[in-house]
Amino acid sequence: MIGAIILAAGSSRRFGGDKRKAELADGITVLTQTIHAAAKLLHSVLVVLRFGDRNYEKELQQQINLPNVSYFLSPDSAKGMAHSLSNAIYHHSDLDAAMIFLADMPFVQEATIKALLNAYAANEDAQPIVLPTVNGTPGHPVIFDKVYFNEIQELEGDRGARPVVDAHQEKLVRIEVEDDGVIRDIDTPRDL
C-alpha cells in the first residue's frame, strides 16, 4: 500500500504567521487543501505536525473528518524537516511506499497525483523513487519505495529527503507534468 505523508511541522518563518492556516482564494486553508488532495487518492494519509500542535491537531480532526487521515506530532520537529520525515517514516513503516507531500504546496493537481501513482505501479519491481518535473525542474510530491525508509530515517537537518534522491539517481522515475503546483510553494502571503 502507498500512503501519504504530509510534512506540516515547519515554523513558517518567512510567512510571518502560520501559513498552514492561511486561506486560499476559495476560503479553504493551505493545509486542508493539501490533506484533501492526498486523501482523495490514497488510502492512508499521515499529517506530520509540530510537537506542540495538540490543539491544532484537534481542530483539524474536527474540520477534516476522514477515516483515512491521521495525525502525528513529531517530537523532533524543531530540528528540521528531515527529522520530522524520519519520525513519520518510523511511525508509518508498514507502507510499501510513501508519497511525501509538503503542506505548503496545495496546488498539486489530482491528475498529477494519479500519474505519479501509476508510474510507481508500473515500476514497482525496480524499487523506484518517483518524482514529478515541470520543464525538467523537480517538484513534489515524491514517492519513495520502502527500500529507502531506513535511509530516510537516518536523515538530519532541514533538507528533507534530497540526499536520498541524490544518492539513487539510477532509481529515479521522472514524470514530466503540466502542473506548476508541483513546484509552487507558499513562502509569503503574496504566494496565496
In which residue ranges do the predicted regions lie?
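Conserved alpha/beta core of the MobA/IspD/sugar-nucleotide pyrophosphorylase nucleotidyltransferase superfamily
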Residues: 1, 150, 154-192
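SAM-dependent methyltransferases
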Residues: 1-3, 65, 122-125, 189-192
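N-terminal glycine-rich phosphate-binding loop and ensuing alpha1 helix
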Residues: 1-54
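Active-site glycine-centered loops adjacent to acidic/histidine catalytic or metal-binding residues
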Residues: 10, 104, 188
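Residues at secondary-structure transition points
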Residues: 15-25, 29, 51, 72-83, ...
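Conserved beta-strand segments of alpha/beta enzyme cores
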Residues: 20, 68-70, 128, 171-173
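Conserved N-terminal catalytic core of the sugar/cofactor nucleotidyltransferase
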Residues: 31-97, 110-111
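Conserved beta-loop-beta/alpha segment of the NTase-like Rossmann-fold superfamily
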Residues: 78-146, 150
